[in-house]
């Protein structure tokens, strides 16, 4: 069965181009030209991945991403304008898994889609039995087998990337983990010095796990070194 992908871009030519290239790779693809139609479809169908443009005519791509992340874990790839670093950081902090800058080569989109699907499938279908079933600290319980995060008795929705970041920090509890180490462990890619991906995801995690994100008690920053969950 081919993976089902949603492509959302108000520029019909771009949406149709990306759709065609993905279909040529064997994916089942549904294009949309506005966010409202896309979210209605996503709520009815089992989607494996979404490609979202930031600029949409009704609701913007960030709002659409937030709607998706309320109930869905599947990977999301954002399309951003050239040079708009703020868009990239915002998208990643809201739960996007990757981004492509316009103008782009459709083959790059295809490659990134395949990469995200492979990661998601490994995440969902891993059969390895962890030596530790859960981690607990200061009212938070991270359940490894069920991929759940419980904070003071209430479940906190984490994206697959957020869960893996938190798990890696717990696995190395008491040690400072650099952004480079964390990125290469979670994303399985080479880290670049100007990469803000880890920082954006840590900020998002803190918003979900701390009453005062600017004064984090769980995930602490060791300036110039990295991040730590203390023992």
UniProtKB/Swiss-Prot annotation:
GO molecular function: phosphorelay response regulator activity; transcription cis-regulatory region binding
Database matches in InterPro entries: CheY-like_superfamily (IPR011006), OmpR/PhoB-type_DNA-bd (IPR001867), Sig_transdc_resp-reg_C-effctor (IPR016032), Sig_transdc_resp-reg_receiver (IPR001789), WalR-like (IPR039420), WH-like_DNA-bd_sf (IPR036388)
Swiss-Prot/TrEMBL induction comment: Expression regulated by upstream promoter elements. Part of the probable VanC-type operon associated with vancomycin resistance.
Intracellular or extracellular location(s): Cytoplasm
CDD domains, sorted: trans_reg_C
Annotated Response regulatory domain residues: 4-117
PANTHER family named in the record: REGULATOR OF RPOS, RESPONSE REGULATOR SAER
Protein name: Regulatory protein VanRc
Gene source species: Enterococcus gallinarum
